[in-house]
Amino acid sequence: MWNNRVILSGNLVRDVEVKVTEGESGKHVANFTVAVQRTRSKEDAVDFINCVAWEQVADYLGSYGKKGKRIELEGRLHTRSYEKDDKKIYITEVYVDDCHLTSNKNSNEEE
């Protein structure tokens, strides 16, 4: 049973870049943002959702994830915090388990 499940459909805000973590394991990670159109809103509002992908998913997005590309993803909410100037900063992001790139926002092409 899924207690923490997120499904999003939106557009990549910029090209996805993959980095390698420090240390012996050197895992591939991609941090990216998805622009998601709000539904049921009287105004044309967009939410910008921060996402993180690891290993194979990160590599896939690094190869094909370009600015404006349509993405459908499934994952889970993840929260973390850190200290800055004696203040605790909280971050909420989506850890991506699976994704599919479809087309650019103004295109009918399929990936």
Predicted features, each with a name:
Residues 1-111:
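Single-stranded nucleic acid-binding surfaces, predominantly the OB-fold ssDNA-binding core
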